[in-house]
Amino acid sequence: MYVVRDIFTAKPGMASKLMKEVMTMPNSPRARILTDLVGDYNTVVMESEYKDLASYEKMMQEYTSQPPELRQKMAGYTDLWQSGRREVLRVVD
């Protein structure tokens, strides 16, 4: 199993709005949304689990082939954050 974390640092005052946008992203039904309690301020994390890397790759292909109207709806969310990164972690049993 793999855990994928998309970690965003929101612009000041935009963390709650970014969190709402991330919660409505398509193809992320299993995602958990996390926010900072201590540590770096304005952090929003979308954490998802995948059985294998092929499942993750399939989700990414679906995500990148969204219809134009959905892409347009999501275009503004990049204005809400100043940096981001992705972590792909293997779960060790």
Predicted regions, residues:
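Short S/T/G/P-rich N-terminal loop/turn motif that feeds into the first structured element of a domain
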Residues: 1-70, 76-93
